[in-house]
Amino acid sequence: MKSIRCKNCNKLLFKADSFDHIEIRCPRCKRHIIMLNACEHPTEKHCGKREKITHSDETVCY
């Protein structure tokens, strides 16, 4: 099981084996986090988790 943490404050958000789409608000720093576990191009060698974090009017993508 993998631990998923907020990229801003490192708070543990949840633990999961797998997921397709998660939207969560960090209870500590209040950032809105959207995580997608999908490959846009499955033939590429490095496919993995994509994460987009939004805060106020600012959007941060990981």
From Swiss-Prot:
Under the heading Pfam families, the entry gives:
Zn_ribbon_Com
Domain of life according to the entry: Bacteria
Q: Which family does it belong to?
A: Belongs to the com family.
Quote the protein name from its UniProt record: Cryptic Mu-phage protein com
Organism name:
Shigella dysenteriae
